[in-house]
Amino acid sequence: MEALILEPSLYTVKAILILDNDGDRLFAKYYDDTYPSVKEQKAFEKNIFNKTHRTDSEIALLEGLTVVYKSSIDLYFYVIGSSYENELMLMTVLNCLFDSLSQMLRKNVEKRALLENMEGLFLAVDEIVDGGVILESDPQQVVHRVALRGEDVPLTEQTVSQVLQSAKEQIKWSLLR
């Protein structure tokens, strides 16, 4: 057995993908260097799509990875983890992402609506997974936090870049007075 299995760890994902009904990438976020180049990533995505787009199942094993997926109208959602990762946790991430987008897009989860709201997608993915580590599994919380990003967020919930931007704004206004 590998030492990796024996070490306690947080639940992690290797990638989150959204492909259209032709297998083309709409969104892809890889959290490790399993596929370091864009060429390798796109080849992997085509391979996943070819294996999964005609089946009704929700899970596949491909290239030593566990892939959970779901389709909606003209989109295919994928969450990829190692072969040792808990499939239920991967499915929880997938359902959280899908349900969050469904709420944000008012149940209109299709390619056109997604492309018009890519910022919300990026924010939702960042709320659910950070650096491959699963942070949130409640779609209500994700939607709430994504909505807050446009408003004043408490300092404890802001990212470093948000804090720096806020500090710049305050300094700028204090100098202009």
UniProtKB/Swiss-Prot annotation:
The UniProt record lists the keyword Phosphoprotein: no
Entry membrane topology: Peripheral membrane protein
Biological process, per Gene Ontology: intra-Golgi vesicle-mediated transport; intracellular protein transport; retrograde vesicle-mediated transport, Golgi to endoplasmic reticulum
One Gene Ontology CC term in the entry: COPI vesicle coat
Subcellular location: Cytoplasm; Golgi apparatus membrane; Cytoplasmic vesicle, COPI-coated vesicle membrane
CDD domains in alphabetical order: Zeta-COP
Keyword Phosphoprotein belongs to the record: no
Modified residues (N-acetylmethionine): 1
Assigned keywords, A-Z: Acetylation, Cytoplasm, Cytoplasmic vesicle, ER-Golgi transport, Golgi apparatus, Membrane, Protein transport, Transport
Pfam families: Clat_adaptor_s
Subunit description: Oligomeric complex that consists of at least the alpha, beta, beta', gamma, delta, epsilon and zeta subunits.
Sequence similarity: Belongs to the adaptor complexes small subunit family.
Function per UniProt: The coatomer is a cytosolic protein complex that binds to dilysine motifs and reversibly associates with Golgi non-clathrin-coated vesicles, which further mediate biosynthetic protein transport from the ER, via the Golgi up to the trans Golgi network. Coatomer complex is required for budding from Golgi membranes, and is essential for the retrograde Golgi-to-ER transport of dilysine-tagged proteins. The zeta subunit may be involved in regulating the coat assembly and, hence, the rate of biosynthetic protein transport due to its association-dissociation properties with the coatomer complex.
Protein name: Coatomer subunit zeta-1
Source species: Bos taurus
